[in-house]
């Protein structure tokens, strides 16, 4: 009977041991995710539960896990205690957001706010209530408020984007206009340069005679007419594009509820002219009707067929017309007389090999004027006898430095100087505008949303000083009790740490203002500007974070990015885990 009782006791003890082992392997460990597959024990030959450190350095009894003694070098055996200094404790926070805290804060007698479920304190030193339901409710309420704020700010941001795109289109039109002006100025400079060369190398009487002919006058008039028509056409194109942008804004912002039939009729007629109304009707017929407010920036800019037809240059583009202006009228007249008169024309220049026109190079300076007079007399006799009909001669340069140049040369030189100066100014202006255009995506945001804020300033009174912040301008410290203003720097760039890509929203959330006024016995002042989403622009806070380095917090709708995009980036930054502290 005694033996039977002992056997029963042994069986019961074995069953309890097996049940405890099974329970220990099935119960989630404290301080771990519920699906922590790496914390699963194995049985050895004696059916004892064993477990290896995550770094593989040791094998322990399963009972050594979370026994408040650090056995593993990597601290992986104590996820739920403070025994290992470098490990992390996982708070489930059911009803709120999970979080990790350092293991040294476990069972330290302090209720950590990150663990709203109180799981970090379980040794009886202090009782931490489970506040996750309340905290989660407050967090979700705050999240909804932030989302509403972001959506309201995003609508203002859309207006900034529309304004930025409008300014970009105007800049494109101005560049196109200047490109034509540069082309015309280049041709004028070349023409005046040729006239200067001709004035310096040709006989004045012959040129004056040609200039007075009706043919020369007609050629000049035709070329001037072509240039004037081209400039006028370019100006009309630019004005057409500008008016189209203005009407786009009217069509986009028009409110039909005001029942202004005149404006409504004008908007409907304009949409029909642009083809927008037909496109909208087609979209309605196919069921592709977007929600109100969605894609409101690009609603008008889809159809440009009518505008492109008006801007098309047809069979006579400027590249073709410019060929008619490349020749000087005098050269055209000379070529027009070619063929029948080539055998009678005599050309002479410094490069001609004829001895008649180079003999003065071998004569003493005092005899050269008499020789030139004799040559002129001979040429006049030949021309009157119809032996030759035309002559171009280069007279030898006078060795007398005080002799003034002919009036025709002076006039031609002044005209060429003015044309060259105009070309230089126009080219510089065009280069400057192209530089501004290239900065749109790198300076004013991915969608040019910051362009509308350029040089707009906002200030905040901080007691002793008032701080003024200007978008893409200066940051200034202004004493409230009088005194000189101090520059904290001018805008330099976004992303001062150079650790993010322009495709990321976080890239546009921080600016640096550098090269401010030098501190006394210190470096130049600078400021780091942190931007956050809001429905209005304002300076929130300013303080001197380090010596001569200021921190400025600014609210602006320009950084109210689409919520889905920001949430995806936030998840990526957190390594795929959404971890939130208590608000």
Swiss-Prot record:
GO terms for cellular component: glucosidase II complex. InterPro entries: Gtb1-like (IPR039794), Man6P_isomerase_rcpt-bd_dom_sf (IPR009011), MRH_dom (IPR044865), PRKCSH (IPR036607), PRKCSH_N (IPR028146). Residues 455-562 form the MRH domain. It is found in: Endoplasmic reticulum. Pfam families: PRKCSH-like, PRKCSH_1. Its main location: endoplasmic reticulum. Keywords: Coiled coil, Disulfide bond, Endoplasmic reticulum, Signal. Disulfide bonds join 91-115, 457-470, 519-548, 533-560. It comes from the Eukaryota. A motif (Prevents secretion from ER) lies at residues 580-583. The keyword Disulfide bond applies. Heterodimer of a catalytic subunit alpha and a subunit beta. This is Glucosidase 2 subunit beta. It comes from Mycosarcoma maydis.
């Amino acid at each position: 009977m005694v033996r039977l009782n002992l056997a029963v006791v042994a069986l019961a003890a074995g069953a309890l041991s097996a049940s405890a082992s099974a329970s220990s392997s099935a119960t989630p460990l404290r301080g771990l995710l519920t699906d922590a597959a790496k914390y699963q024990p194995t049985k050895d030959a004696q059916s004892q539960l064993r477990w290896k450190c995550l770094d593989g350095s040791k094998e322990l009894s399963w009972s050594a896990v979370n026994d408040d003694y650090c056995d593993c070098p990597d601290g992986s055996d104590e996820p739920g205690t403070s025994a290992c200094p470098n490990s992390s404790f996982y708070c489930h926070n059911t009803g709120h957001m999970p979080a990790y805290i350092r293991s040294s804060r476990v069972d330290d007698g302090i209720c950590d706010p990150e663990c709203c479920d109180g799981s970090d304190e379980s040794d009886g030193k202090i009782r931490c209530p489970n506040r996750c339901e309340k905290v989660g409710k407050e967090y979700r309420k705050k999240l909804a408020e932030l989302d509403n704020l972001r959506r309201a700010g995003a609508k203002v941001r859309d207006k900034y984007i529309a304004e930025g795109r409008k300014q970009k289109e105007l800049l494109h039109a101005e560049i196109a206009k200047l490109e034509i002006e540069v082309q015309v100025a280049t041709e004028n400079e070349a023409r005046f340069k040729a006239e200067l060369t001709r004035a310096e190398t040709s006989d004045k009487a012959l040129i004056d005679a040609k200039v007075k002919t009706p043919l020369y006058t007609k050629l000049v008039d035709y070329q001037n007419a072509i240039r004037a028509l081209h400039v006028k056409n370019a100006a009309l194109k630019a004005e057409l594009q500008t008016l189209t942008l203005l009407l786009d804004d009217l069509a986009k912002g028009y409110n039909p509820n005001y029942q202004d039939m005149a404006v409504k009729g004008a908007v409907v007629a304009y949409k029909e002219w642009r083809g927008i109304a037909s496109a909208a009707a087609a979209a309605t017929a196919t069921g592709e009707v977007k929600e109100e407010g969605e894609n409101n920036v690009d609603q008008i800019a889809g159809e440009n067929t009518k505008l492109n037809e008006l801007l098309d240059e047809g069979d006579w583009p400027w590249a073709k017309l410019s060929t008619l202006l490349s020749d000087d009228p005098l050269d055209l007249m000379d070529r027009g007389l070619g063929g029948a008169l080539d055998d009678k024309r005599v050309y002479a220049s410094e490069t001609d090999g004829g001895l008649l026109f180079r003999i003065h190079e071998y004569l003493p300076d005092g005899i050269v004027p008499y020789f030139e007079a004799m040559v002129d007399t001979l040429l006049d006799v030949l021309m009157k006898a119809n032996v030759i009909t035309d002559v171009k001669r280069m007279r030898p340069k006078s060795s007398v430095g005080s002799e003034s140049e002919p009036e025709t040369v002076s006039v031609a030189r002044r005209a060429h100087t003015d044309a060259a100066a105009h070309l230089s100014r126009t080219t510089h202006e065009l280069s400057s505008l192209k530089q501004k255009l290239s900065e749109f995506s790198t300076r004013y945001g991915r969608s040019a949303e910051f362009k509308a804020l350029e040089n707009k300033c906002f200030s905040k009174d901080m007691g002793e000083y008032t701080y003024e912040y200007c978008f893409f301008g200066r940051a200034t410290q202004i004493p409230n009790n009088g005194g000189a203003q101090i520059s904290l720097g001018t805008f330099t760039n976004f992303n001062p740490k150079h650790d993010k890509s322009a495709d990321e929203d976080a890239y546009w959330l921080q600016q640096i203002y550098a090269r401010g006024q030098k501190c006394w016995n210190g470096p130049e002042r600078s400021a780091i500007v942190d931007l956050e989403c809001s429905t209005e622009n304002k300076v929130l806070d300013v303080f001197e974070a380090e010596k001569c380095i200021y921190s400025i917090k600014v609210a602006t709708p320009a950084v109210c990015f689409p919520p889905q995009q920001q949430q995806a980036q936030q998840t990526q930054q957190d390594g795929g885990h959404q971890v939130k502290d208590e608000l």
